[in-house]
A protein has these predicted regions:
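Donor nucleotide-sugar binding/catalytic pocket of nucleotide-sugar-dependent glycosyltransferases
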Residues: 126-168
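Nucleotide-activated donor-binding/catalytic signature segment of Leloir-type glycosyltransferases, i.e.
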Residues: 222-238
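Conserved acidic donor-binding segment of nucleotide-sugar-dependent glycosyltransferases
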Residues: 290-291, 295-302, 311-316
């Protein structure tokens, strides 16, 4: 039952069961108790499965959203790019027609390419019109503030980084040469380049192991990984205590993506003091500083990827230093509790109600 004195937020985004970054962010909100501070109702607009299943879920979600909208003060719409943008634009329009305050939460690392290369000028005008409907517009980092600020102006934009629950510190073993990857297993995440550098690293460091945690989206890449199965281990999608165990046991984390928003997996690796190798895309430079909290590789470039991984494999002291610095940065800048305080301040700024603090 809703309490009349509390802020009422209707949130829409991928179903919480979906394997992906936005669902992870939403689940972190629930784990941290956001639903106890406000009256929060979450509607999953997308599920994994067949096209028919996805279509039925989208229709069901929209009907549910329309039925609940009159009872809520704020509609918080989580959006990426491409099909996600088209789905969520319908929800945004409905909320404005119902005279509700709208928070648009932009997560899509591929939005610049979608906006600049895939849309006509007419399509870009539509995007600007939809995005301008937000009473508040949340982005993941400074690069996104600049990009979306050029489209809709910066007045209503707030930087709200992704955040996680920081685990209790544990003694970590470095020099074990265990590399962890977590995320979608596809070309855009740099999996092809990662698999390409592994044979050379295996020659230099015979005990090296690469653990791939995710769902395959490319059968050709999966076949390449299976050919290296002696030292490339396919974990499937992992979560909960199993994910935490690998984050603790692996001394190196790698994410060689072509583009990103702000990957939660990098935050999790930081919080677990991993030596990190990733690419300078999206909001990753807000998290990783070269030579301080991690190392960079150039997207699509096997040379720099192999060199950065080799540096950490060769130097456990460097790995320990980078991991320790990353852990401290995660504690001070990416704690879920601080993130929720910022989110509640955004809600309060556009609503007449106040959150309830237990």
């Amino acid at each position: 039952m809703m309490r009349e004195d509390r802020m009422r937020v209707l949130m829409a985004g991928p179903d919480r069961s979906v394997h992906g970054g936005i669902s992870g962010v939403v689940n972190n909100y629930y784990d941290a108790g956001l639903d106890r501070m406000i009256d929060l109702c979450y509607i999953g607009t997308m599920v994994e499965g067949t096209k028919l299943r996805k279509l039925l879920q989208a229709v069901k979600a929209y009907i549910c959203f329309l039925s609940k909208l009159p009872h809520y003060d704020i509609a918080h719409v989580n959006m990426a790019s491409d099909s996600s943008y088209y789905r969520k634009s319908v929800f945004i329009r409905a909320a404005k027609l119902c005279r509700r305050k709208v928070v648009i939460h932009q997560h899509g690392g591929n939005f610049p390419e979608f906006y600049e290369k895939e849309l006509s000028e007419r399509g870009r005008r539509r995007v600007r019109r939809i995005l301008s409907m937000g009473d508040a517009f949340l982005v993941l980092g400074t690069v996104w503030m600049d990009f979306f600020g050029a489209i809709i102006g910066k007045e209503r934009i707030t930087v709200l980084p992704n955040a996680i629950r920081i685990p209790e510190p544990k003694e970590k073993q470095y020099g074990v040469h265990k590399i962890l990857y977590m995320g979608r297993l596809c070309k855009a995440k740099g999996i092809g380049e990662l698999l390409a550098v592994m044979p050379g690293l295996k020659e230099q460091y015979p005990d090296v192991r690469l653990y791939l945690a995710g769902i395959w989206e490319d059968t050709e890449l999966k076949a390449k990984a299976e050919a290296l199965k002696d030292y490339v281990i396919d974990l499937g999608w992992i979560g909960g205590t199993q994910k935490q165990r690998y984050l603790e046991e692996c001394d190196i984390f790698v994410l060689p993506s072509y583009f990103e928003g702000q990957p939660v997996s990098v935050l999790e690796a930081m919080a677990n003091a991993c030596g990190i190798v990733t690419t300078k895309t999206g909001s990753i430079p807000d998290m990783i500083i070269e030579g301080d909290t991690g190392l960079f590789a150039v997207p699509r470039d096997t040379k720099t990827l192999g060199e950065s991984l080799s540096r950490l494999l060769a130097d456990s002291d460097l790995c320990r230093t980078l991991g320790g610095n990353a852990r401290r940065k995660a504690e001070t800048e990416f704690s879920i509790d601080n993130n929720i305080k910022k989110l509640l301040a955004v809600y309060e700024a556009i609503s007449c109600r106040e959150p309830h603090h237990e």
